[in-house]
Amino acid sequence: MRMVRLTLAKFFCALLLSLVASTTLFGQAQKYQGKPVLIIQFEPKDQPLDASELHAILPLKQGQPLRVADVRASIERLFATGRYTDIQVDAEPYTEGATQGVIVRFLTKNAWFIGSVTDAGSINNPPRAGQLENASRLELGQPFNDQKIQDAVGAQKRLLDSNGLFLGKVTPSFTYNDSFQQIDIRFEVDSGLRARFSQPVLQGDVKLDPNIILKATKFRRWLIHTWKPMTQSRVSEALDSVRSLYQRENRLEARVSLESMKYDAQTNSALPTLQIDAGPRILVNTIGAKISKGQLQHYVPIFEEHSVDDDLLLEGAHNLRDYLQSQGYFDAEVAYKPQRVVNDQATIDFIVNTGPRHKLAAIEISGNHYFNTDAIRERMYLQKASLLQFPHGRYSESLLRRDRDAIVNLYQSNGFLAVKVNSRTQENYRGKPEDLAVFLEIQEGPQSFVNTLDVEGIEHLDMKKVLGSLSSVQGQPFSEFSVAVDRDTILAQYFDKGFANATFEWNSQPSPRPNRVDLHYIIHEGQQEFVRKVLVSGLKYTRPELVNRNLTLNSGDPLSPTQITDTQRKLYDLGVFSRVDQAIQNPDGDMPDKYVLYQLDEARRYSVAFGVGAELGRIGGCNDCLDAATGAAGFYPRVSMDVARNNLWGLAHTISLRTQFSTLEQRALLNYSWPRFEDNDKLTLSFTGLFDNSKDIRTYNYTRLEGAVQLSQRLSRDITLLYRLAYRRVSVSDLKVTPFLVNILSQPDHVGIGSINLVQDRRDDPLDPHRGVYNTVDLGLAEHFFGSQRDFTRVLVRNASYYPVGRKMVLARSTEIGNISVFHYFGIPADALPLPERFFGGGDSHRGFPEYQAGPRDGLTGFPLGGDALFFNQTELRFPLIGDSIGGVLFHDMGNIYSSFDHFSFRVHQDNLQDFNYMVHAIGFGIRYKTPVGPLRVDLAYSINPPYFNGFNGTTEQLINAGPVPCPAPAGAPYQCNVQNVSHFQYFFSIGQTF
């Protein structure tokens, strides 16, 4: 008997040898050749595959004659599963009753696969634990071996060294999971003390004062001149800073690199050695046109690449030509002339011939029949001249080539395989020497169609469903683009069903019918793979059931990449994991069932955020400004601090405290959020407590205490319902109103209100919408049943819609209607609703008013009192203004706050100084500047018919002593009235569109 040992590293060599002489591998087994195999055994008994799976994949079968070829094929098949690193085959005679045969034993050594990889211990940041884990390059689910661990330890040690932690130690430890052949790796890190920089050594052709270079490195602290601790980022910033230093000296080819970093253990210091080759000074000039240095640095790539060669200079010449053409110099020519180095200086001249300045006055398109002209223009970069956005148009030869290619691709993707697009330019267009026209002539040619489509190879999917998703079907235009779309569509369906190795081939041939093509698709499905089990690791505080509820994969499901990624997204959406890694264990193994792995890193459970800001503008309600009922301009600093405890109870619940302090308002909001309430992904329950103290913002100062519970239900992708029950107590003070109203309006307000809010959002971009609708309906009921002292209903409806106008403009409109109806009240109707519950408006809702300044006012002081009804309508025409980043807005706002819905009116004239129930109109112009967080908004509004009212010209004491005497004040009164009005001009500044 002879034992054969195969290791994975020698597997392919063993196969090659087996082809030469099978007796070399199984020489002793020859004497058992042909004898029946009575028993097949595996040692150890616990195998990574079930007994049924093992016997199913083995060519060697029990009861059949022993053949060396079957043994060899069995070894190959076992290795192909990827589950083994070592296999030994042993055979010995065995007698069972009267039958003499052999026992074949497979002695196996299991493979191991990488599970979780964590770094812990004494880690001095930087680097962070996550950076060390990434440096190890140990990928989840990949085969494990000792060499990978050695490489990982070395890589982490190098990362520590690069951050000055030269004494750091990395020690790996392992946890084995025999059931899943998975090994979790933990690196215990002891960072040690961080080294500090020391005086750097400068080598090479420096050409600058070493002290200036040392200052540029910033290795040493300013003023106190002590050396900073070494980190990788500081080294990188130092090299960049030194390079910038040479750049400022016009030494564009300067080379700065870190030659070495020597560690001195006695002083715990790091000695950097910088290799510097300054190179000559290089001056870049333009001859024939004046181009700023900034433009040269932007368009000539030698400044970015820190190198000078003919390719970069030629690219710079082309870029400068395109820039000049975009400025209207359509005939511009640019060439470069490099000079030799003389006295440590080289000059590069770009010779520019701008030619006359033109304006792209027309773009004429002809020959198009299949597509209309507007559809073609939408795909073009060329733009006719417009007054502000493109004063000379947008034109260059490269843009013209790009547009021709875009039109060709458009036609070819719709079956016009022989399409041609010719272009020509015409100067002196319509007799104007400065005008230029571009003419595009399209020769469409014949359109090709699919005559027949034959699909071969679909066995495991629904043929009808697959064919229904294709675009290249009988009678449709034929193009390679459509075939590519079909390929992606078919393979996506196969991948989603676990056919990871599915392939797609196609061919075509002309049909006997003219301009018709017969298509033939060939699909090779390959082996379907399934989920053996989903393994989740990394949970410390999070409950497993929370994760399990969000798994879209289960054992036995097809191994779908779509579902794997969808689960990853859902786990991220929980908001409790900073990192979710997903992988397939043993991805290259030839097995139909595979483990899906998710390695989770829990985010920090506590988070703290600080903010600093300010408000600048006209704020209403100034205590010391009784003669300025529309407010006073000022600067109001603001700070905020938010503290949150995430993943409470391990269930993704969150409790947070958000605070804001300013000279105008002090605010604290305590919120408890329970997402996926009752295991429903569409429900979120939240509890809120609010303290809000405000002054100098409205007619009154107030202190608000509120508790609320809210249930959010997502009905569909764009519709959400909010059910809310709130109880609040609001006390007001420092009212700037007629004295006899103070006692009535300053009573503490206790309101319990239940409300339902429906939100429908179908906008294409919530930050800057161009199409779609946004609707909200808010219905509220305050009643004694909810603990409310006042009974009323509240309705607030808003509808906003957005319509593209042509290619560039957007027409946006928003209408808001609200009404509050009081019931079970037997006093004076005007005083039935407390001030804090009334509607206040202005500012963003109507730009003809400052914030909170719309609606009824006090007859003595002129300060706003709010109302029971509102109507606001805003219309904007948004259009590009300058280039692609700056847009303009023309707007019209109309509406007002009304004392009651019965007094709603569209009239535009104010009857008297006590009449505020009329429609105020405002027009204006705004600018929008695109930023990553939304457009920066500046609006200037002109109110056409602002309200006039009686104002109070006196002190607070005079107001208190005034009594119920109305304006105009009689002779000898302790105060004087003066007629005021809301200013015709208002301005607003914020981030985001108005609506």
What do these predicted ranges mean?
Residues 1-13:
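Bacterial N-terminal signal peptides that target proteins for export
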Residues 4, 28-626, 636-642, 656-674, ...:
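Periplasmic polypeptide-binding modules associated with outer-membrane biogenesis and secretion
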Residues 10-22:
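Bacterial N-terminal signal peptides
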Residues 91, 551, 584, 608-616, ...:
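Transmembrane beta-strand segments that form the barrel wall of outer-membrane beta-barrel proteins
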Residues 573, 589, 595-596, 607, ...:
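C-terminal outer-membrane beta-barrel translocator/porin domains of Gram-negative envelope proteins
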Residues 578, 606-608, 648-655, 677-685, ...:
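Repeated loop/turn-to-beta-strand initiation elements of outer-membrane beta-barrel proteins
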Residues 645-647, 674-676, 691, 713, ...:
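Residue-level signature of outer-membrane beta-barrel architecture
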Residues 664-748:
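Transmembrane beta-barrel wall of Gram-negative outer-membrane proteins
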